[in-house]
């Protein structure tokens, strides 16, 4: 039973940086930046919460272990409820999470966050932000600089192109996923 979610939330689409297991698979270890990363992220999320008078909800990465890493300063953390929170969100914040697709499909404002500690992750952030016509938000900027940023802008043309290029082949096809799978299987057999 999912609680009533209204657009009172700012949703952070978490990628479990710097603990994400994929880094270990490629021989990278970014745990040394954890304290600085989470300190800066919390300062920024508190800023954005105050600016818009909205609660920040962390939509945790499915493999996150925040029961081991108490890093979000008492912010609400939800697991496996990302779509529901994005659907009712005011804005979404991320680095380059694949769950950004939910925000695009649902036409939600997205801001792509960067800080110098995650230089190793700048390329994917740049790529997704650019494809959606968004500038990257450097959370190391001063409050006066951050105050100038429009966090609620949506570029409809870029969102539609992103959907066509990266999410679906045919936006006119209104069948659900399983109807498409069944039709493709029937063609083959």
Language-model regions, residue ranges each:
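Short, surface-exposed amphipathic charged segments that create phosphate/polyanion-binding patches used
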Residues: 2-8, 91-96, 148-155
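Donor nucleotide-activated moiety binding/catalytic core segment of transferases
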Residues: 54-106, 110, 116
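C-terminal alpha-helical cap of glycosyltransferases
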Residues: 167-189
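Alpha-helix boundary/N-cap detector
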Residues: 36-39, 154-157, 176
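Conserved catalytic-core segment of nucleotide-activated headgroup transferases in glycan assembly
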Residues: 1-67
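Catalytic binding pocket for nucleotide-activated donors in carbohydrate/polymer assembly enzymes
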Residues: 69-74, 98-172
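Hydrophobic, Leu/Ile/Phe/Ala-enriched alpha-helical segments that form helix-helix packing faces
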Residues: 40-52, 103, 132, 146-149, ...
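A short acidic, often aromatic-flanked loop/helix-cap motif at beta-alpha or helix-coil junctions
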Residues: 1, 65, 82-87, 141-148
């Amino acid at each position: 039973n999912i609680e009533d979610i209204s657009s009172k939330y700012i949703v952070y689409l978490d990628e479990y940086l710097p603990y994400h297991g994929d880094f270990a698979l490629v021989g990278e270890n970014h745990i040394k930046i954890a304290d600085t990363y989470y300190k800066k992220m919390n300062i920024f999320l508190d800023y954005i919460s105050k600016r818009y008078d909205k609660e920040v909800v962390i939509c945790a990465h499915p493999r996150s272990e925040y029961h081991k890493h108490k890093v979000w300063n008492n912010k609400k953390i939800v697991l496996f409820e990302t779509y529901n929170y994005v659907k009712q969100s005011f804005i979404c914040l991320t680095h380059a999470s694949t769950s950004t697709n939910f925000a695009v499909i649902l036409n939600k404002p997205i801001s792509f966050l960067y800080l110098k500690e995650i230089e190793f992750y700048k390329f994917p952030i740049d790529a997704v932000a650019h494809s959606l016509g968004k500038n990257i938000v450097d959370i190391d900027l001063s409050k006066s600089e951050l105050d100038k940023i429009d966090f609620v802008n949506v570029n409809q043309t870029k969102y539609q192109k992103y959907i066509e290029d990266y999410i679906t082949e045919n936006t006119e096809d209104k069948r659900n996923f399983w109807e498409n799978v069944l039709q493709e299987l029937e063609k083959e057999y």
